[in-house]
Regions:
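Charged docking surfaces used in two-component/phosphorelay signaling
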Residues: 15-23
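Acidic, metal-coordinating helix/loop segments flanking the phosphotransfer/catalytic sites
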Residues: 30-48
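Acidic catalytic/metal-coordinating carboxylates
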Residues: 32-36, 59-65
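Receiver (REC) domain active-site loop signature in two-component systems and cognate sites
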Residues: 55
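Alpha4 helix (beta4-alpha4-beta5 surface) of REC/receiver domains from two-component response regulators
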Residues: 62, 85-100
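Conserved two-component signaling phosphotransfer/partner-docking surface
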Residues: 87, 107-108
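A Lys-centered signature of the CheY-like receiver
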Residues: 104
């Protein structure tokens, strides 16, 4: 079974995302911030990371920058899911190693 780590400080977004991903057959783990997300990746590297940009403790861009230099950190597909919708943020995310960029809010 494919695994997805949701890294988002919003409990509501994590809940909605979990529902969508489980419906698609993913096993889901959650983290409330980037540091917690990196800790989860140390325990078990997921196949996919659904990542918010603005979070306390460690932002999404800090998370992906650190993830991509770790052993095995180049493997997960990383999808930013954020309210940041300007071209500069999208470019920065893709340059840091994101595979996709989705705008919030989203429907399921």
């Amino acid at each position: 079974m494919k695994t997805c780590l949701i890294v988002d400080d919003s409990r509501v977004i994590r809940k909605v995302s979990r529902h969508i991903l489980e419906t698609l057959g993913f096993q889901v783990e959650e983290a409330e911030n980037g540091q917690e997300g990196l800790d989860r990746c140390t325990e078990a590297m997921p196949d996919v990371v659904l990542l918010d940009w603005n979070m306390p403790v460690m932002t999404g861009i800090e998370f992906i920058t650190q993830l991509r230099v770790r052993e095995g950190g180049d493997k997960p597909k990383v999808v930013f899911c954020t309210t940041e919708n300007d071209v500069a943020h999208i470019r920065e995310a893709i340059s840091a190693g994101a595979d996709e960029y989705v705008m919030k809010p989203f429907d399921h």
